[in-house]
Amino acid sequence: MHDKTWSGRFNEPVSELVKQYTASIGFDRRLAEWDIQGSLAHAQMLKETGVLDEGDLADIRRGMAEILEEIRSGKIEWSSDLEDVHMNIERRLTDKIGDAGKRLHTGRSRNDQVATDIRLWLRDQITVIQSLIQSLQTALLDLAEQNAETVMPGFTHLQVAQPVSFGHHMLAYVEMLGRDNERMADCRRRVNRMPLGAAALAGTTYPIRREITAELLGFEQICQNSLDAVSDRDFAVEFTAAASLIMVHLSRLSEELILWMSPRFGFIDIADRFCTGSSIMPQKKNPDVPELVRGKSGRVIGHLIGLITLMKSQPLAYNKDNQEDKEPLFDTADTLIDTLRIYADMMRGVTVKPDNMRAAVMQGFATATDLADYLVKKGMPFRDAHEVVAQAVRHADEAGVDLSELPLEVLQGFSDLIADDVYGVLTPEGSLNARNHLGGSAPEQVRFQVKRWREMSA
């Protein structure tokens, strides 16, 4: 007699090599607690529809409680001979309670069972991720509030462009994370649909009531097509895509932190606990955490491509290919959760160096656009103002000074519209304060946005 639940069809046992190759217990046992949740809800529904009696349900609940304790204490022995988490738990349950354990799988297939387990697990991961996104946003909001007036260069093409504040810069990432949170919430709506009851692919002949199971498991909707229910992994791809975008955003911030911490910039310092040294160079303080975040973003993006590729050629309904969805999905969630958790802590350990930031602003003619706007407001067409200021910048560059350091008579040599009030717009602070509109970089607007985000998060 074979040891497989499906072995009656076969004339010889599966080879050891095939067992090792096809077994998923090494990674899908992670779904054990969610598998038990689904089984308990399924058992309750079977009892309410008359498939199981009260005694069977009581035995199943007792047995599952014991198995759950074994799992949490690390005492359960997982067997690759039983292939996966579902059969391991079912065999353990049957060993404990006998025939009632064998009845549990009535009206159910591993196809809809695993699809349910993954959705239950992923739903919980998304809840954790959304909380961690908000925690990181809070850390960034604290930095933004503290640095609403801390002038730094805004860049395009990594060249000094216009003055902004460090607070305004941090708020850009708060906005990105806000969209990330929205995407996760939207993804969760599609994750939160129950496939259980689809059985192998066509449904079941038993008088099941899927709405009972859905309510017990907290699913907001029920998958309406049994073929789609067992073969759908859109939700996994969608989650991994949303996770990839978060990692891309954090990778962009990491790149900036790495640059800003370098002596060539010197805009910030990162607390020692997030950095490492060199085995040969005593002076080194390396920003390993943001570097690793930058690297791990590629890992998560790779999982997205892997899942899309996994699904692209599968006919309906379930195929063994889908066993390969779990490891990239698990690793995506783990990587994202770990990254968000450490990132919030790291941002609380960032020290800003305002003097270095302001000095960088003064080296790049960052207020040139402000001078052009000044001339336009005095009646000069913008294209003419652009040309006049370009000539002034070239002169200042050759003289080795900032526009604000040019004498008035020199500036007036470029246009007689220039008066001594020009110096109010040529300072970085004047440039910031002039942009006092919704979404602008003025300190007043930064404080408004910080307040708005705090109120939305409350």
From Swiss-Prot:
Record GO cellular component, one term: cytosol
Primary location class: cytoplasm
Gene Ontology biological process terms, A to Z: arginine biosynthetic process via ornithine; L-arginine biosynthetic process
Subcellular locations according to the entry: Cytoplasm
Gene3D superfamilies recorded: Fumarase/aspartase (C-terminal domain), Fumarase/aspartase (Central domain), Fumarase/aspartase (N-terminal domain)
UniProt GO molecular function: argininosuccinate lyase activity
Alphabetic keyword roster: Amino-acid biosynthesis, Arginine biosynthesis, Cytoplasm, Lyase
Pathway named in the protein's UniProt entry: Amino-acid biosynthesis; L-arginine biosynthesis; L-arginine from L-ornithine and carbamoyl phosphate: step 3/3
Entry EC number(s): 4.3.2.1
Record's catalysed reaction(s): 2-(N(omega)-L-arginino)succinate = fumarate + L-arginine
InterPro entries: Arg_succ_lyase_C (IPR029419), Argininosuccinate_lyase (IPR009049), Fumarase/histidase_N (IPR024083), Fumarate_lyase_CS (IPR020557), Fumarate_lyase_fam (IPR000362), Fumarate_lyase_N (IPR022761), L-Aspartase-like (IPR008948)
Ranges that cross the membrane: none
PROSITE patterns xref list: FUMARATE_LYASES
HAMAP family, per the entry: Arg_succ_lyase
Family: Belongs to the lyase 1 family. Argininosuccinate lyase subfamily.
Xref: PANTHER family: ARGININOSUCCINATE LYASE (PTHR43814:SF1)
Name of the protein in its database record: Argininosuccinate lyase
